[in-house]
Protein backbone atom coordinates (compact mmCIF):
# COMPACT_ATOMS: atom_id res chain seq x y z
CA UNK A 1 0.00 0.00 0.00
CA UNK A 2 1.31 3.44 -0.98
CA UNK A 3 1.24 6.38 1.39
CA UNK A 4 0.54 10.00 0.53
CA UNK A 5 -0.15 13.20 2.43
CA UNK A 6 -2.95 15.75 2.57
CA UNK A 7 -1.98 19.06 0.95
CA UNK A 8 -5.34 20.87 0.75
CA UNK A 9 -8.80 20.59 2.32
CA UNK A 10 -11.78 22.59 1.01
CA UNK A 11 -15.01 21.33 2.55
CA UNK A 12 -15.40 17.67 1.59
CA UNK A 13 -12.82 17.95 -1.25
CA UNK A 14 -9.35 16.78 -0.21
CA UNK A 15 -6.20 17.04 -2.35
CA UNK A 16 -3.58 14.36 -1.68
CA UNK A 17 0.01 14.12 -2.94
CA UNK A 18 1.68 10.77 -3.71
CA UNK A 19 5.09 9.88 -5.11
CA UNK A 20 5.24 9.64 -8.93
CA UNK A 21 5.51 5.82 -8.94
CA UNK A 22 2.61 5.15 -6.54
CA UNK A 23 -0.30 7.23 -7.86
CA UNK A 24 -3.68 5.66 -6.95
CA UNK A 25 -6.15 4.72 -9.71
CA UNK A 26 -9.41 6.62 -10.22
CA UNK A 27 -12.17 5.55 -7.79
CA UNK A 28 -9.66 3.92 -5.42
CA UNK A 29 -10.58 4.22 -1.75
CA UNK A 30 -8.04 6.07 0.41
CA UNK A 31 -7.94 5.92 4.21
CA UNK A 32 -6.75 8.49 6.73
CA UNK A 33 -6.18 7.05 10.24
CA UNK A 34 -7.95 9.14 12.93
CA UNK A 35 -8.24 8.85 16.71
CA UNK A 36 -11.89 7.80 16.47
CA UNK A 37 -11.54 5.39 13.53
CA UNK A 38 -10.66 6.25 9.95
CA UNK A 39 -11.69 8.74 7.29
CA UNK A 40 -12.44 7.29 3.84
CA UNK A 41 -11.90 9.23 0.60
CA UNK A 42 -12.50 8.32 -3.04
CA UNK A 43 -10.15 9.44 -5.84
CA UNK A 44 -12.04 11.55 -8.40
CA UNK A 45 -9.31 12.98 -10.65
CA UNK A 46 -5.57 13.30 -11.22
CA UNK A 47 -4.74 17.02 -11.28
CA UNK A 48 -1.01 16.89 -12.12
CA UNK A 49 2.14 17.33 -9.99
CA UNK A 50 1.50 13.89 -8.43
CA UNK A 51 -1.72 15.14 -6.87
CA UNK A 52 -5.17 13.56 -6.77
CA UNK A 53 -8.47 15.27 -5.96
CA UNK A 54 -10.66 13.20 -3.63
CA UNK A 55 -14.11 13.35 -2.08
CA UNK A 56 -14.62 12.46 1.56
CA UNK A 57 -17.42 10.16 2.76
CA UNK A 58 -17.10 11.54 6.30
CA UNK A 59 -16.91 15.12 7.64
CA UNK A 60 -13.42 16.63 7.31
CA UNK A 61 -13.56 18.52 10.63
CA UNK A 62 -10.13 18.53 12.25
CA UNK A 63 -8.28 17.20 9.19
CA UNK A 64 -4.90 18.89 8.78
CA UNK A 65 -2.43 19.35 5.94
CA UNK A 66 0.35 16.81 6.11
CA UNK A 67 -1.87 14.03 7.48
CA UNK A 68 -0.89 10.56 6.28
CA UNK A 69 -3.12 8.96 3.61
CA UNK A 70 -3.10 5.22 2.77
CA UNK A 71 -4.07 3.92 -0.70
CA UNK A 72 -6.13 0.72 -0.30
CA UNK A 73 -5.35 -0.08 -4.01
CA UNK A 74 -9.01 -0.96 -4.72
CA UNK A 75 -12.39 0.79 -4.92
CA UNK A 76 -14.62 1.03 -1.87
CA UNK A 77 -15.82 -2.52 -1.08
CA UNK A 78 -18.92 -3.51 0.88
CA UNK A 79 -20.09 -6.78 2.49
CA UNK A 80 -22.39 -8.96 0.36
CA UNK A 81 -24.29 -12.20 0.78
CA UNK A 82 -26.90 -13.63 3.14
CA UNK A 83 -25.14 -12.12 6.15
CA UNK A 84 -26.37 -8.68 5.03
CA UNK A 85 -30.07 -9.68 5.17
CA UNK A 86 -32.06 -8.02 7.94
CA UNK A 87 -29.34 -5.40 8.45
CA UNK A 88 -28.95 -1.67 7.75
CA UNK A 89 -25.76 -0.24 6.25
CA UNK A 90 -24.16 3.07 5.37
CA UNK A 91 -22.27 3.77 2.14
CA UNK A 92 -19.07 2.20 3.53
CA UNK A 93 -20.85 -1.08 4.29
CA UNK A 94 -20.79 -0.43 8.06
CA UNK A 95 -23.84 -1.63 10.03
CA UNK A 96 -26.04 1.15 11.47
CA UNK A 97 -28.44 -0.96 13.53
CA UNK A 98 -26.28 -1.69 16.62
CA UNK A 99 -26.77 -5.43 16.16
CA UNK A 100 -23.14 -6.49 16.22
CA UNK A 101 -20.76 -7.41 13.43
CA UNK A 102 -22.01 -8.43 10.00
CA UNK A 103 -21.71 -12.18 9.42
CA UNK A 104 -20.42 -11.87 5.87
CA UNK A 105 -17.02 -13.08 4.71
CA UNK A 106 -17.31 -11.70 1.17
CA UNK A 107 -16.95 -8.12 -0.01
CA UNK A 108 -17.37 -6.62 -3.49
CA UNK A 109 -16.23 -3.29 -4.99
CA UNK A 110 -19.06 -0.82 -5.64
CA UNK A 111 -17.61 0.17 -9.03
CA UNK A 112 -18.24 -2.65 -11.50
CA UNK A 113 -18.98 -3.01 -15.19
CA UNK A 114 -22.52 -3.68 -16.42
CA UNK A 115 -23.24 -7.23 -17.68
CA UNK A 116 -22.24 -7.87 -21.30
CA UNK A 117 -24.84 -8.03 -24.08
CA UNK A 118 -24.43 -11.81 -24.32
CA UNK A 119 -25.32 -12.22 -20.62
CA UNK A 120 -28.58 -10.24 -20.69
CA UNK A 121 -32.01 -11.83 -20.57
CA UNK A 122 -35.22 -9.97 -21.42
CA UNK A 123 -38.51 -10.93 -19.83
CA UNK A 124 -42.13 -10.13 -20.59
CA UNK A 125 -43.60 -11.75 -17.49
CA UNK A 126 -46.08 -9.67 -15.46
CA UNK A 127 -45.24 -9.04 -11.80
CA UNK A 128 -48.49 -8.65 -9.83
CA UNK A 129 -48.41 -5.84 -7.25
CA UNK A 130 -51.91 -6.04 -5.76
CA UNK A 131 -52.45 -2.32 -6.51
CA UNK A 132 -55.34 -1.99 -8.98
CA UNK A 133 -54.30 1.09 -10.92
CA UNK A 134 -50.76 -0.23 -11.46
CA UNK A 135 -51.71 -3.79 -12.40
CA UNK A 136 -54.35 -2.56 -14.86
CA UNK A 137 -52.78 0.49 -16.55
CA UNK A 138 -49.00 0.10 -16.08
CA UNK A 139 -48.23 -3.57 -15.35
CA UNK A 140 -44.71 -4.25 -14.11
CA UNK A 141 -42.35 -6.57 -15.97
CA UNK A 142 -40.41 -9.06 -13.86
CA UNK A 143 -36.79 -7.98 -14.20
CA UNK A 144 -37.79 -4.52 -15.48
CA UNK A 145 -37.25 -0.96 -14.27
CA UNK A 146 -40.22 0.93 -12.91
CA UNK A 147 -40.32 4.63 -12.01
CA UNK A 148 -42.81 6.37 -9.71
CA UNK A 149 -42.73 10.03 -10.75
CA UNK A 150 -44.23 12.92 -8.84
CA UNK A 151 -43.63 16.23 -7.10
CA UNK A 152 -43.28 16.79 -3.37
CA UNK A 153 -45.96 15.25 -1.15
CA UNK A 154 -48.00 13.31 -3.73
CA UNK A 155 -47.25 9.86 -2.29
CA UNK A 156 -44.14 8.40 -3.97
CA UNK A 157 -42.61 7.03 -0.77
CA UNK A 158 -45.94 5.60 0.46
CA UNK A 159 -46.38 3.86 -2.90
CA UNK A 160 -42.83 2.46 -2.78
CA UNK A 161 -43.42 1.25 0.81
CA UNK A 162 -46.70 -0.40 -0.22
CA UNK A 163 -44.94 -2.13 -3.12
CA UNK A 164 -42.23 -3.38 -0.74
CA UNK A 165 -44.88 -4.71 1.63
CA UNK A 166 -47.00 -6.35 -1.09
CA UNK A 167 -44.27 -7.82 -3.25
CA UNK A 168 -41.86 -8.78 -0.48
CA UNK A 169 -44.62 -10.77 1.24
CA UNK A 170 -45.76 -12.45 -2.02
CA UNK A 171 -42.29 -12.66 -3.61
CA UNK A 172 -39.93 -15.45 -2.59
CA UNK A 173 -36.60 -13.75 -3.39
CA UNK A 174 -34.57 -11.09 -1.61
CA UNK A 175 -35.07 -7.32 -1.52
CA UNK A 176 -32.56 -4.47 -1.29
CA UNK A 177 -33.71 -0.97 -0.31
CA UNK A 178 -31.45 2.02 -1.05
CA UNK A 179 -32.44 5.28 0.66
CA UNK A 180 -30.76 7.96 -1.47
CA UNK A 181 -30.87 11.47 -0.03
CA UNK A 182 -34.27 11.06 1.61
CA UNK A 183 -35.54 11.84 5.12
CA UNK A 184 -34.01 9.92 8.03
CA UNK A 185 -37.45 9.74 9.67
CA UNK A 186 -38.89 7.89 6.66
CA UNK A 187 -35.99 5.43 6.77
CA UNK A 188 -36.60 4.79 10.46
CA UNK A 189 -40.35 4.33 9.90
CA UNK A 190 -39.71 1.93 7.01
CA UNK A 191 -37.29 -0.14 9.08
CA UNK A 192 -39.83 -0.59 11.90
CA UNK A 193 -42.68 -1.32 9.46
CA UNK A 194 -40.63 -4.01 7.74
CA UNK A 195 -39.70 -5.48 11.10
CA UNK A 196 -43.36 -5.57 12.17
CA UNK A 197 -44.55 -7.12 8.88
CA UNK A 198 -41.87 -9.83 9.00
CA UNK A 199 -40.16 -8.99 5.67
CA UNK A 200 -36.95 -7.58 7.21
CA UNK A 201 -35.14 -10.99 7.39
CA UNK A 202 -35.30 -11.11 3.56
CA UNK A 203 -34.25 -7.49 3.07
CA UNK A 204 -30.98 -5.57 3.04
CA UNK A 205 -31.20 -1.81 3.62
CA UNK A 206 -28.65 0.90 2.85
CA UNK A 207 -29.08 4.57 3.72
CA UNK A 208 -27.35 7.78 2.69
CA UNK A 209 -29.75 10.41 3.90
CA UNK A 210 -30.39 14.13 3.24
CA UNK A 211 -27.94 15.36 5.88
CA UNK A 212 -24.98 13.37 4.51
CA UNK A 213 -22.14 14.59 2.30
CA UNK A 214 -22.76 14.62 -1.49
CA UNK A 215 -20.22 11.81 -2.06
CA UNK A 216 -22.30 9.56 0.22
CA UNK A 217 -25.54 10.37 -1.61
CA UNK A 218 -23.83 9.79 -4.97
CA UNK A 219 -22.43 6.37 -4.03
CA UNK A 220 -25.14 4.92 -1.76
CA UNK A 221 -27.16 3.68 -4.76
CA UNK A 222 -24.05 1.80 -5.96
CA UNK A 223 -23.64 0.22 -2.51
CA UNK A 224 -27.22 -1.11 -2.61
CA UNK A 225 -26.89 -2.19 -6.24
CA UNK A 226 -23.66 -4.11 -5.52
CA UNK A 227 -25.44 -6.09 -2.78
CA UNK A 228 -28.32 -6.83 -5.19
CA UNK A 229 -25.90 -7.89 -7.95
CA UNK A 230 -24.33 -10.48 -5.65
CA UNK A 231 -27.72 -12.09 -5.00
CA UNK A 232 -28.40 -12.11 -8.75
CA UNK A 233 -25.01 -13.40 -9.94
CA UNK A 234 -23.82 -15.69 -7.14
CA UNK A 235 -27.06 -16.80 -5.46
CA UNK A 236 -28.98 -16.85 -8.79
CA UNK A 237 -31.95 -15.10 -7.20
CA UNK A 238 -34.68 -12.81 -8.54
CA UNK A 239 -33.96 -9.64 -6.56
CA UNK A 240 -36.10 -6.58 -5.87
CA UNK A 241 -34.18 -3.29 -5.74
CA UNK A 242 -35.97 -0.25 -4.33
CA UNK A 243 -34.35 3.18 -4.80
CA UNK A 244 -35.88 6.17 -3.03
CA UNK A 245 -35.07 8.66 -4.55
CA UNK A 246 -33.23 8.42 -7.87
CA UNK A 247 -33.49 12.20 -8.40
CA UNK A 248 -31.40 12.78 -5.25
CA UNK A 249 -28.70 10.66 -6.91
CA UNK A 250 -28.72 13.10 -9.83
CA UNK A 251 -28.69 16.05 -7.43
CA UNK A 252 -25.71 14.62 -5.53
CA UNK A 253 -23.89 14.29 -8.86
CA UNK A 254 -24.60 17.96 -9.53
CA UNK A 255 -23.14 18.94 -6.13
CA UNK A 256 -20.05 16.78 -6.65
CA UNK A 257 -19.55 18.24 -10.14
CA UNK A 258 -19.64 21.77 -8.71
CA UNK A 259 -17.26 20.83 -5.88
CA UNK A 260 -14.78 19.46 -8.42
CA UNK A 261 -15.00 22.65 -10.50
CA UNK A 262 -16.57 21.15 -13.62
CA UNK A 263 -18.42 23.40 -16.09
CA UNK A 264 -22.19 23.11 -15.47
CA UNK A 265 -24.60 21.97 -18.18
CA UNK A 266 -28.31 22.79 -18.71
CA UNK A 267 -30.11 24.14 -15.59
CA UNK A 268 -26.86 23.75 -13.63
CA UNK A 269 -26.68 19.95 -13.93
CA UNK A 270 -23.37 18.16 -14.31
CA UNK A 271 -22.09 17.70 -17.89
CA UNK A 272 -21.77 13.95 -17.17
CA UNK A 273 -25.46 13.54 -16.19
CA UNK A 274 -26.38 11.00 -18.91
CA UNK A 275 -23.15 9.03 -18.36
CA UNK A 276 -23.62 8.78 -14.57
CA UNK A 277 -27.27 7.76 -14.92
CA UNK A 278 -26.41 5.20 -17.61
CA UNK A 279 -23.58 3.70 -15.53
CA UNK A 280 -26.04 3.04 -12.68
CA UNK A 281 -29.07 1.97 -14.73
CA UNK A 282 -27.21 -0.39 -17.08
CA UNK A 283 -26.03 -2.42 -14.08
CA UNK A 284 -29.66 -2.88 -12.99
CA UNK A 285 -30.21 -5.70 -15.46
CA UNK A 286 -31.57 -9.22 -15.74
CA UNK A 287 -29.07 -11.88 -16.77
CA UNK A 288 -29.18 -15.61 -17.42
CA UNK A 289 -28.25 -16.13 -13.73
CA UNK A 290 -31.11 -14.13 -12.22
CA UNK A 291 -33.03 -10.86 -12.39
CA UNK A 292 -33.11 -7.47 -10.68
CA UNK A 293 -36.52 -5.80 -10.73
CA UNK A 294 -36.08 -2.18 -9.70
CA UNK A 295 -38.62 0.30 -8.36
CA UNK A 296 -37.37 3.87 -8.40
CA UNK A 297 -39.08 6.90 -6.89
CA UNK A 298 -38.38 9.95 -9.06
CA UNK A 299 -38.92 13.37 -7.48
CA UNK A 300 -40.10 15.89 -10.09
CA UNK A 301 -38.95 19.40 -9.05
CA UNK A 302 -41.79 21.95 -9.26
CA UNK A 303 -43.84 19.27 -11.12
CA UNK A 304 -41.72 20.00 -14.22
CA UNK A 305 -41.43 16.79 -16.27
CA UNK A 306 -39.03 18.51 -18.71
CA UNK A 307 -36.34 18.97 -16.04
CA UNK A 308 -33.08 17.41 -17.39
CA UNK A 309 -32.58 15.49 -14.13
CA UNK A 310 -35.97 13.79 -14.58
CA UNK A 311 -35.64 13.31 -18.36
CA UNK A 312 -32.30 11.51 -17.83
CA UNK A 313 -34.21 8.74 -16.02
CA UNK A 314 -37.07 8.31 -18.53
CA UNK A 315 -35.17 6.44 -21.22
CA UNK A 316 -34.17 3.67 -18.81
CA UNK A 317 -37.66 2.82 -17.52
CA UNK A 318 -39.93 -0.03 -18.68
CA UNK A 319 -42.97 1.32 -16.83
CA UNK A 320 -43.79 4.78 -15.57
CA UNK A 321 -46.22 5.59 -12.76
CA UNK A 322 -47.10 9.30 -12.87
CA UNK A 323 -48.42 10.67 -9.56
CA UNK A 324 -50.60 13.72 -10.10
CA UNK A 325 -51.08 16.53 -7.57
CA UNK A 326 -54.64 17.28 -8.75
CA UNK A 327 -55.67 13.71 -7.83
CA UNK A 328 -53.98 13.94 -4.42
CA UNK A 329 -55.90 17.19 -3.79
CA UNK A 330 -59.15 15.26 -4.38
CA UNK A 331 -57.96 12.55 -1.92
CA UNK A 332 -57.89 9.99 -4.74
CA UNK A 333 -55.09 7.76 -3.42
CA UNK A 334 -52.87 6.31 -4.78
CA UNK A 335 -52.73 9.52 -6.85
CA UNK A 336 -51.66 7.70 -10.03
CA UNK A 337 -52.73 9.39 -13.27
CA UNK A 338 -54.00 6.55 -15.51
CA UNK A 339 -53.69 8.75 -18.61
CA UNK A 340 -50.02 9.67 -18.05
CA UNK A 341 -48.83 6.27 -16.76
CA UNK A 342 -47.67 3.60 -19.18
CA UNK A 343 -45.84 0.30 -19.47
CA UNK A 344 -43.84 -1.44 -22.18
CA UNK A 345 -45.68 -4.71 -21.53
CA UNK A 346 -49.25 -3.37 -21.79
CA UNK A 347 -49.51 -5.35 -24.99
CA UNK A 348 -52.15 -7.98 -25.89
CA UNK A 349 -49.38 -10.47 -26.70
CA UNK A 350 -48.04 -10.17 -23.13
CA UNK A 351 -50.98 -9.37 -20.83
CA UNK A 352 -53.72 -10.95 -22.95
CA UNK A 353 -56.51 -9.48 -25.07
CA UNK A 354 -59.01 -9.00 -22.22
CA UNK A 355 -56.60 -7.12 -19.93
CA UNK A 356 -55.41 -4.90 -22.80
CA UNK A 357 -58.97 -4.06 -23.95
CA UNK A 358 -60.23 -3.26 -20.42
CA UNK A 359 -57.18 -1.02 -19.73
CA UNK A 360 -57.57 0.89 -23.00
CA UNK A 361 -61.35 1.25 -22.53
CA UNK A 362 -60.79 2.65 -19.01
CA UNK A 363 -58.33 5.20 -20.45
CA UNK A 364 -60.77 6.04 -23.26
CA UNK A 365 -63.61 6.78 -20.82
CA UNK A 366 -61.36 8.86 -18.54
CA UNK A 367 -59.96 10.82 -21.51
CA UNK A 368 -63.51 11.61 -22.73
CA UNK A 369 -64.42 12.80 -19.21
CA UNK A 370 -61.32 15.02 -19.18
CA UNK A 371 -62.30 16.49 -22.58
CA UNK A 372 -65.82 17.25 -21.30
CA UNK A 373 -64.74 18.94 -18.06
CA UNK A 374 -64.52 22.43 -19.61
CA UNK A 375 -68.02 22.05 -21.08
CA UNK A 376 -69.36 20.85 -17.71
CA UNK A 377 -67.68 23.77 -15.89
CA UNK A 378 -69.25 26.36 -18.23
CA UNK A 379 -72.64 24.89 -19.19
CA UNK A 380 -73.28 22.20 -16.58
CA UNK A 381 -74.13 18.51 -16.89
CA UNK A 382 -77.61 19.25 -18.31
CA UNK A 383 -76.18 20.35 -21.67
CA UNK A 384 -74.46 17.01 -22.31
CA UNK A 385 -75.94 14.30 -24.53
CA UNK A 386 -77.32 11.18 -22.85
CA UNK A 387 -74.30 9.20 -24.07
CA UNK A 388 -71.86 11.73 -22.59
CA UNK A 389 -73.78 11.82 -19.29
CA UNK A 390 -73.38 8.04 -19.06
CA UNK A 391 -69.66 8.32 -19.91
CA UNK A 392 -69.15 10.93 -17.16
CA UNK A 393 -71.03 8.82 -14.60
CA UNK A 394 -68.93 5.74 -15.40
CA UNK A 395 -65.69 7.77 -15.48
CA UNK A 396 -66.40 9.09 -11.97
CA UNK A 397 -67.04 5.55 -10.73
CA UNK A 398 -63.82 4.35 -12.39
CA UNK A 399 -61.86 7.25 -10.82
CA UNK A 400 -63.07 6.23 -7.38
CA UNK A 401 -62.58 2.51 -8.01
CA UNK A 402 -58.95 3.22 -8.93
CA UNK A 403 -58.41 4.27 -5.28
CA UNK A 404 -57.38 1.66 -2.76
CA UNK A 405 -56.65 1.55 1.00
CA UNK A 406 -52.94 0.91 1.66
CA UNK A 407 -51.49 -1.43 4.27
CA UNK A 408 -48.71 1.03 5.14
CA UNK A 409 -51.14 3.89 5.77
CA UNK A 410 -53.64 1.92 7.91
CA UNK A 411 -52.43 3.73 11.02
CA UNK A 412 -53.30 7.14 9.49
CA UNK A 413 -56.54 6.32 7.66
CA UNK A 414 -58.08 3.70 9.93
CA UNK A 415 -58.97 1.66 6.81
CA UNK A 416 -57.48 -1.86 6.57
CA UNK A 417 -55.20 -2.33 3.54
CA UNK A 418 -56.38 -4.36 0.54
CA UNK A 419 -54.40 -6.58 -1.86
CA UNK A 420 -56.39 -7.06 -5.08
CA UNK A 421 -55.45 -9.82 -7.52
CA UNK A 422 -55.08 -8.98 -11.20
CA UNK A 423 -58.05 -11.23 -12.10
CA UNK A 424 -60.32 -9.35 -9.66
CA UNK A 425 -59.02 -5.98 -10.90
CA UNK A 426 -59.87 -6.78 -14.53
CA UNK A 427 -63.30 -8.20 -13.56
CA UNK A 428 -64.17 -5.09 -11.53
CA UNK A 429 -63.34 -2.55 -14.24
CA UNK A 430 -64.95 -4.69 -16.95
CA UNK A 431 -68.24 -4.76 -15.02
CA UNK A 432 -68.18 -0.96 -14.52
CA UNK A 433 -67.52 -0.42 -18.25
CA UNK A 434 -70.38 -2.80 -19.14
CA UNK A 435 -72.74 -0.74 -16.97
CA UNK A 436 -73.53 -3.50 -14.46
CA UNK A 437 -73.11 -1.09 -11.55
CA UNK A 438 -74.57 2.13 -12.98
CA UNK A 439 -77.21 2.10 -10.23
CA UNK A 440 -74.68 2.14 -7.37
CA UNK A 441 -73.73 5.49 -5.78
CA UNK A 442 -70.29 6.92 -6.64
CA UNK A 443 -69.08 6.91 -3.03
CA UNK A 444 -69.52 3.12 -2.84
CA UNK A 445 -66.51 2.72 -5.16
CA UNK A 446 -64.20 4.93 -3.09
CA UNK A 447 -61.38 3.23 -1.12
CA UNK A 448 -62.55 -0.34 -1.61
CA UNK A 449 -60.70 -3.44 -2.84
CA UNK A 450 -62.72 -5.64 -5.22
CA UNK A 451 -65.99 -4.84 -7.02
CA UNK A 452 -67.78 -7.11 -4.51
CA UNK A 453 -66.58 -4.76 -1.73
CA UNK A 454 -68.11 -1.83 -3.67
CA UNK A 455 -71.46 -3.64 -3.92
CA UNK A 456 -71.35 -4.39 -0.17
CA UNK A 457 -70.49 -0.74 0.55
CA UNK A 458 -73.48 0.39 -1.57
CA UNK A 459 -75.79 -1.83 0.52
CA UNK A 460 -74.42 -0.26 3.70
CA UNK A 461 -74.99 3.25 2.31
CA UNK A 462 -78.57 2.44 1.26
CA UNK A 463 -79.29 1.04 4.73
CA UNK A 464 -78.32 4.33 6.41
From Swiss-Prot:
Binding site for ATP: 150-157
InterPro entries: AAA+_ATPase (IPR003593), ATP-synt_VA_C (IPR055190), ATP_synth_F1_bsu (IPR005722), ATPase_a/bsu_AS (IPR020003), ATPase_alpha/beta_chains (IPR050053), ATPase_F1/V1/A1_a/bsu_N (IPR004100), ATPase_F1/V1/A1_a/bsu_N_sf (IPR036121), ATPase_F1/V1/A1_a/bsu_nucl-bd (IPR000194)
Annotated compartments: Cell membrane
Record SMART domains: AAA
First-level EC class: translocase
Superkingdom of origin: Bacteria
Catalyzed reaction equations: ATP + H2O + 4 H(+)(in) = ADP + phosphate + 5 H(+)(out)
GO cellular component: plasma membrane; proton-transporting ATP synthase complex
Family: Belongs to the ATPase alpha/beta chains family.
PANTHER family: ATP SYNTHASE (PTHR15184), ATP SYNTHASE SUBUNIT BETA, MITOCHONDRIAL (PTHR15184:SF71)
Family annotation (NCBIfam families): atpD
Name this polypeptide is given: ATP synthase subunit beta
Lineage: Bacteria, Bacillati, Chloroflexota, Dehalococcoidia, Dehalococcoidales
Amino acid sequence: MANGKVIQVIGSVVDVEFSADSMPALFNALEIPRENGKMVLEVQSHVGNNRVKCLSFTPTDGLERGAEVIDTTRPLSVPVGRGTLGRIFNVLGEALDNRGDVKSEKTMPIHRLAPGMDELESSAQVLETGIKVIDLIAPFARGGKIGALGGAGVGKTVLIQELIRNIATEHEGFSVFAGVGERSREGNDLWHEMEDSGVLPKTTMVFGQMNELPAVRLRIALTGLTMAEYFRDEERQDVLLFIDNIYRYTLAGMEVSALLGRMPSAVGYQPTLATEMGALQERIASTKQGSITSFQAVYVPADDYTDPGVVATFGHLDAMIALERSLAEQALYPAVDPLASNSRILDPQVVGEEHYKVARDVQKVLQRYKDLQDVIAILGMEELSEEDKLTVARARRIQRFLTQPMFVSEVFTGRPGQYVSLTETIRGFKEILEGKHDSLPEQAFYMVGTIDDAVAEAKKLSAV
